[in-house]
Amino acid sequence: MDGKRKHIMTQLPDTGKVTLKTFAGKHKYLTGAGCVLSGISAVISLVPYLCMWKVIKLAVLNWPEGPDGGMLVYWGWMAVASSLFSMLIYFGALMCTHISAFRTARNMKTVALHHLTELPIGYFKGTGSGKLRRIIDDGAGQTETYLAHQLPDLAGALVTPAAVLVLLLVFDWRFGLISLIPMAAGAFFLSRMMGTGMAECMRQYQNALEDMNNEAVEYVRGIPVVKTFQQSIFSFKSFHDSIMRYKDWAVNYTLSLRIPMCCYSVSINGIFAVLIPAGLLLAGDAARGEAYVTTVLDLVFYILFTPVCVTMMDKIMWTSENTVAANDALERILNIIREKPLPEPAVPRKPENHRIEIKDVSFSYNKDGVNALDHVSLTVPQGATAAMVGASGSGKTTLVSLIPRFFDVDRGSICIGGVDVRDMGTKELMKQVSFVFQDSRLFKDSLLNNIRAARPKADKEEVMRAVKAARCEDIIEKMPQGLDTVVGTKGVYLSGGEMQRIALARAILKDAPIVLLDEATAFADPDNEYLIQQAFEKLVEGKTVIMIAHRLSTVCRADCIFVMEEGRVAEQGNHDELLKARGLYAKMWKDYQTSVEWKVGGMA
């Protein structure tokens, strides 16, 4: 599979080369074989109509004596045999296309998911997991359905009208031309509906649907707030707006198709309105006798066969839309695969120590936008605890996220132990750093495996030592199966503070020399806050620590405090030094003290 992935990745610079056949690999020939078999099946499926016409012809030409019974049996069995043979061939076609479709969908998922593991963590901060799941899972499923069912049906639908047209022109060129006129008009209006603009319409449809789905998830999450404050959907303006945008798109798109759709329907379904009067006219011009009977029989033949063309053209219309949808799904998956991983060094270097140096760093999330960080320089000695404080949007989280290389800096460098993080390689860098974020996530797995994710080879005793160090014993004790309890099933859920303690146990087990902490106690209840603080003290023993602080009470004992403002380091020093400077930090401390002393109603 890795060879297949590399083969696909080498073709990505030329976007025109990557198609569903690329993901199908050697199984693409099965897709072609399935389409050919489907076309053959479609042609053979016309034989029963021909047999039916032969029976009618025998009955008419041999009236009143009656047709030869042997010939009637012959054509009857011919109709049955051709129907069975057509179904058998179609079954073989579906077997081929299903095998190819399953392999194609598997390859699409595997390549995309494997590529996601190589992308920097920063990519996932801007792209929701729900959106990625929908693109990969639903996209692969959509292409699987298209390849397995709709593509062979489309092949049959394209072959059938061609075969029927040949028959129509061979039997009686006059009836053939008359039948061809409304079908040609229908094909013209069909091309107008399914032309080059369909791809853009499908892209807009998927975008509108995606936005509405994302906003729906946020709305569902906010239902407790809606019910508490007796709000309506209109209070969630973004969700309401996304629904309105989707509605507007659907209505406008439908209205844009009403004229060509009506013209197509009238043209295709109007074949009989042209064919029958023309047939009666031609029959009337024929002399009474064999020519008259032959003309009427030819008319019957065309009445039997032209509905097949109508049905097939309708199928072409619907499968053409599915073709556009499958191509759009493929393009969305390719957009993920085209995301470039951060470059890895040919020979990774190891840091000499755990001193962190940030040298003249500038960074922007949008390369054409305003810098989130602007010429930032600072140093955190090995074993020191540094705190980042500042208003929301000042650049604290951005700066910390650059240290483990969630993103690459636009300018300057970040070094650990004298080695640029870009020269360390992802594996070595991840060995050096542990993370504890506010929104710590747990897998739907046992607590043991959740903690052991930091070090998969750790034994149960090592995990238990980390559990005790993180003050998680009470969590484990109340679980039905202890460490083997699966989180997120059968009513087993953890509070936010408990999840933070499990995350701390995970970080303690990893025992990395550098700890990056987004203050874990900001939203914890008092009991959990006390336990988290104890676990935190155990975690940071002898480590180089950088903490994003949301409450100034947690930074008083930090060795160095960096005050961020508009993407720059406005002040730095320890707590006492910054208070004496009477600058931004002193003002923030004063405001914090005022908020702590504030009581409801102004009462002490």
Role assignments for model-derived ranges:
Residues 21, 25-29, 121, 138-147, ...:
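An intracellular "coupling" helix at the cytosolic face of ABC transporter transmembrane type-1 domains
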Residues 95-103, 107, 192-211, 320:
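Cytoplasmic juxtamembrane "membrane-exit" helices immediately C-terminal to transmembrane segments
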Residues 352-604:
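ABC-type nucleotide-binding domain
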Residues 43-54, 85-88, 152-195, 253-301, ...:
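A hydrophobic transmembrane-helix motif
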Residues 1-45, 64-75, 93, 97, ...:
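Membrane-integrated ABC transporters
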Residues 231, 255-258, 308-336:
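Cytosolic ends of transmembrane helices, especially the final helix of ABC transmembrane type-1 domains
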Residues 29-48, 61-105, 294-304, 311-312:
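Transmembrane-helix motif of ABC transporter permease domains
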